[in-house]
């Protein structure tokens, strides 16, 4: 529905690469050009995103490290330790590919 509004969005950021790729597919079906008419980004940097055109701009997340941190907390909890809610920052990286254009280029 959002893509059918007037004026439509100039960019969409989805919470996963799969959802971002589905937006690109839908945009193409509607006659929109990515990134000329609509910029699209995702999260995860999964391997297959470069198999589609345009190649998806995404945020690479340190999934392995996220699993390590989570497992350490889980093991502490299983060991009977009272674990308080914590916030852990893990570095991430913007991977710029072909699915976005600068606003002044649109």
Which sequence ranges carry the predicted segments?
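Flexible loop/turn connectors
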Residues: 1-106
């Amino acid at each position: 529905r959002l893509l059918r509004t007037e004026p439509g969005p100039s960019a969409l950021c989805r919470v996963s690469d799969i959802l971002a790729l589905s937006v690109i597919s839908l945009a193409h079906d509607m006659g929109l050009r990515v990134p000329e008419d609509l910029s699209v980004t995702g999260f995860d940097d999964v391997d297959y995103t470069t198999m589609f055109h345009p190649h998806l701009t995404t945020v690479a997340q340190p999934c392995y490290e996220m699993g390590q941190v989570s497992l350490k907390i889980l093991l502490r909890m299983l060991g009977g330790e009272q674990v308080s809610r914590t916030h852990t920052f893990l570095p991430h990286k913007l991977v710029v590919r072909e699915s976005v254009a600068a606003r002044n280029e649109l």
